[in-house]
Amino acid sequence: MERLAIYPGTFDPFTNGHLDVLERALTIFDKVYIVLAENSKKSSLFTVDERCSMIREITASTSGVSVEVLHGGLLAEYAHSVGATAIVRGLRQVKDFEYEFQLSLLNRHLNPEVTTVFLMPNVKYTYVASSIIREVALLGGDVSKFVHPCVLAMLKKKYEEQNAQ
Protein backbone atom coordinates (compact mmCIF):
# COMPACT_ATOMS: atom_id res chain seq x y z
CA MET A 1 0.00 0.00 0.00
CA GLU A 2 1.37 3.37 -1.03
CA ARG A 3 2.00 5.82 1.82
CA LEU A 4 0.60 9.22 0.81
CA ALA A 5 0.91 12.59 2.50
CA ILE A 6 0.00 16.17 1.76
CA TYR A 7 2.30 19.10 2.43
CA PRO A 8 0.12 22.23 2.49
CA GLY A 9 1.18 25.85 2.53
CA THR A 10 1.02 29.16 0.75
CA PHE A 11 4.69 28.82 -0.28
CA ASP A 12 5.00 32.50 -1.18
CA PRO A 13 7.73 31.81 -2.17
CA PHE A 14 8.88 28.21 -1.82
CA THR A 15 12.17 28.30 0.11
CA ASN A 16 15.04 25.88 0.58
CA GLY A 17 13.55 25.26 4.02
CA HIS A 18 10.33 24.05 2.38
CA LEU A 19 12.39 21.89 0.04
CA ASP A 20 14.31 20.42 2.97
CA VAL A 21 11.06 19.46 4.73
CA LEU A 22 9.75 17.94 1.47
CA GLU A 23 12.90 15.87 1.05
CA ARG A 24 12.59 14.65 4.64
CA ALA A 25 8.93 13.76 4.04
CA LEU A 26 9.88 11.72 0.98
CA THR A 27 12.02 9.47 3.19
CA ILE A 28 8.84 8.54 5.07
CA PHE A 29 6.15 8.67 2.36
CA ASP A 30 5.99 7.22 -1.15
CA LYS A 31 4.21 10.26 -2.53
CA VAL A 32 3.78 13.79 -1.24
CA TYR A 33 1.19 16.17 -2.63
CA ILE A 34 2.38 19.74 -2.26
CA VAL A 35 -0.92 21.55 -1.79
CA LEU A 36 -0.98 25.28 -2.34
CA ALA A 37 -3.67 26.73 -0.17
CA GLU A 38 -4.94 30.25 -0.47
CA ASN A 39 -4.83 32.06 2.84
CA SER A 40 -7.19 35.03 3.03
CA LYS A 41 -5.19 36.35 6.00
CA LYS A 42 -2.04 36.66 3.89
CA SER A 43 -1.53 38.90 0.89
CA SER A 44 0.48 37.01 -1.69
CA LEU A 45 3.36 38.34 -3.75
CA PHE A 46 3.04 35.57 -6.32
CA THR A 47 -0.12 34.22 -7.92
CA VAL A 48 -1.07 30.60 -7.33
CA ASP A 49 -0.04 29.81 -10.91
CA GLU A 50 3.38 31.43 -10.41
CA ARG A 51 3.92 29.51 -7.18
CA CYS A 52 2.87 26.22 -8.79
CA SER A 53 5.18 26.86 -11.72
CA MET A 54 8.17 27.56 -9.48
CA ILE A 55 7.54 24.51 -7.28
CA ARG A 56 7.08 22.26 -10.32
CA GLU A 57 10.39 23.50 -11.73
CA ILE A 58 12.16 22.94 -8.39
CA THR A 59 10.75 19.42 -7.98
CA ALA A 60 10.82 18.35 -11.64
CA SER A 61 13.52 15.73 -11.08
CA THR A 62 12.10 14.52 -7.76
CA SER A 63 9.95 11.41 -7.95
CA GLY A 64 6.94 11.05 -5.73
CA VAL A 65 5.91 14.72 -5.79
CA SER A 66 2.71 16.23 -7.15
CA VAL A 67 1.87 19.94 -6.98
CA GLU A 68 -1.82 20.72 -6.51
CA VAL A 69 -4.02 23.69 -5.63
CA LEU A 70 -6.74 23.55 -3.00
CA HIS A 71 -9.59 25.69 -4.33
CA GLY A 72 -11.57 26.10 -1.15
CA GLY A 73 -12.63 23.29 1.09
CA LEU A 74 -10.99 21.70 4.07
CA LEU A 75 -7.52 20.22 4.10
CA ALA A 76 -8.73 17.16 6.00
CA GLU A 77 -11.29 16.50 3.26
CA TYR A 78 -8.67 16.97 0.55
CA ALA A 79 -6.39 14.47 2.32
CA HIS A 80 -9.23 11.95 2.31
CA SER A 81 -10.00 12.60 -1.38
CA VAL A 82 -6.45 11.71 -2.47
CA GLY A 83 -6.04 8.86 0.01
CA ALA A 84 -3.43 10.62 2.13
CA THR A 85 -3.11 9.54 5.74
CA ALA A 86 -0.75 12.30 6.83
CA ILE A 87 -0.37 16.06 6.70
CA VAL A 88 3.25 17.18 6.73
CA ARG A 89 4.09 20.41 8.52
CA GLY A 90 7.46 22.00 9.01
CA LEU A 91 8.36 23.40 12.41
CA ARG A 92 11.19 25.92 12.54
CA GLN A 93 10.84 27.13 16.09
CA VAL A 94 8.89 26.38 19.26
CA LYS A 95 6.52 29.28 18.54
CA ASP A 96 5.34 27.49 15.36
CA PHE A 97 4.18 24.52 17.44
CA GLU A 98 1.20 26.05 19.25
CA TYR A 99 -0.59 27.09 16.06
CA GLU A 100 0.32 23.89 14.22
CA PHE A 101 -0.78 21.76 17.18
CA GLN A 102 -4.24 23.40 17.15
CA LEU A 103 -4.55 22.80 13.41
CA SER A 104 -3.48 19.18 13.78
CA LEU A 105 -6.14 18.55 16.43
CA LEU A 106 -8.81 20.16 14.27
CA ASN A 107 -7.76 18.16 11.20
CA ARG A 108 -7.78 14.98 13.28
CA HIS A 109 -11.32 15.80 14.45
CA LEU A 110 -12.46 16.44 10.87
CA ASN A 111 -10.74 13.34 9.52
CA PRO A 112 -9.77 10.77 12.19
CA GLU A 113 -7.76 8.85 9.58
CA VAL A 114 -5.26 11.67 9.08
CA THR A 115 -2.23 12.29 11.27
CA THR A 116 -0.10 15.42 11.26
CA VAL A 117 3.61 14.75 10.98
CA PHE A 118 5.86 17.54 12.20
CA LEU A 119 9.28 17.72 10.58
CA MET A 120 12.10 20.06 11.48
CA PRO A 121 14.24 21.47 8.68
CA ASN A 122 18.00 21.54 8.74
CA VAL A 123 19.15 24.00 11.39
CA LYS A 124 20.46 26.36 8.70
CA TYR A 125 16.84 27.00 7.63
CA THR A 126 15.25 27.47 11.06
CA TYR A 127 15.12 31.24 10.67
CA VAL A 128 14.08 31.23 7.01
CA ALA A 129 10.47 32.26 6.41
CA SER A 130 8.85 33.26 3.14
CA SER A 131 7.89 36.64 4.60
CA ILE A 132 11.51 37.35 5.55
CA ILE A 133 12.72 36.27 2.11
CA ARG A 134 10.23 38.65 0.45
CA GLU A 135 11.28 41.55 2.65
CA VAL A 136 15.02 41.02 2.25
CA ALA A 137 14.62 40.63 -1.53
CA LEU A 138 12.47 43.77 -1.70
CA LEU A 139 15.22 45.73 0.04
CA GLY A 140 17.85 44.40 -2.37
CA GLY A 141 19.41 41.82 -0.05
CA ASP A 142 20.94 38.56 -1.23
CA VAL A 143 18.58 35.63 -0.63
CA SER A 144 20.30 33.25 -3.06
CA LYS A 145 21.30 30.83 -0.27
CA PHE A 146 17.69 30.43 0.80
CA VAL A 147 15.78 29.93 -2.47
CA HIS A 148 16.14 28.01 -5.72
CA PRO A 149 17.53 30.04 -8.66
CA CYS A 150 14.10 30.10 -10.37
CA VAL A 151 12.58 31.67 -7.24
CA LEU A 152 15.40 34.19 -7.08
CA ALA A 153 14.77 35.17 -10.70
CA MET A 154 11.03 35.51 -10.08
CA LEU A 155 11.61 37.64 -6.97
CA LYS A 156 13.87 39.99 -8.93
CA LYS A 157 11.38 40.18 -11.80
CA LYS A 158 8.41 40.80 -9.50
CA TYR A 159 10.13 43.60 -7.59
CA GLU A 160 11.47 45.20 -10.78
CA GLU A 161 7.90 45.25 -12.13
CA GLN A 162 6.62 46.82 -8.91
CA ASN A 163 9.38 49.44 -8.88
CA ALA A 164 8.65 50.35 -12.51
CA GLN A 165 5.07 51.28 -11.65
Swiss-Prot record:
Site residues by UniProt (Transition state stabilizer): 18
Family the UniProt entry places it in: Belongs to the bacterial CoaD family.
Cellular localisation: Cytoplasm
Catalysed transformations (reactions): (R)-4'-phosphopantetheine + ATP + H(+) = 3'-dephospho-CoA + diphosphate
Record's keyword annotation contains Nucleotidyltransferase: yes
Superkingdom assignment: Bacteria
CDD domains linked: PPAT
Entry's Gene Ontology cellular component terms: cytoplasm
Its job: Reversibly transfers an adenylyl group from ATP to 4'-phosphopantetheine, yielding dephospho-CoA (dPCoA) and pyrophosphate.
Magnesium as UniProt keyword: yes
Pathway(s) the chain acts in: Cofactor biosynthesis; coenzyme A biosynthesis; CoA from (R)-pantothenate: step 4/5
Subunit record text: Homohexamer.
GO biological process: coenzyme A biosynthetic process
Cofactor: Mg(2+)
Signal peptide: none
Residues reported to bind ATP: 10-11, 18, 90-92, 100, 125-131
Protein name in the entry: Phosphopantetheine adenylyltransferase
Pfam families associated with the record: CTP_transf_like (PF01467)
GO molecular function: ATP binding; pantetheine-phosphate adenylyltransferase activity
Lineage, opening ranks: Bacteria, Pseudomonadati, Chlorobiota, Chlorobiia, Chlorobiales
Keywords: ATP-binding, Coenzyme A biosynthesis, Cytoplasm, Magnesium, Nucleotide-binding, Nucleotidyltransferase, Transferase
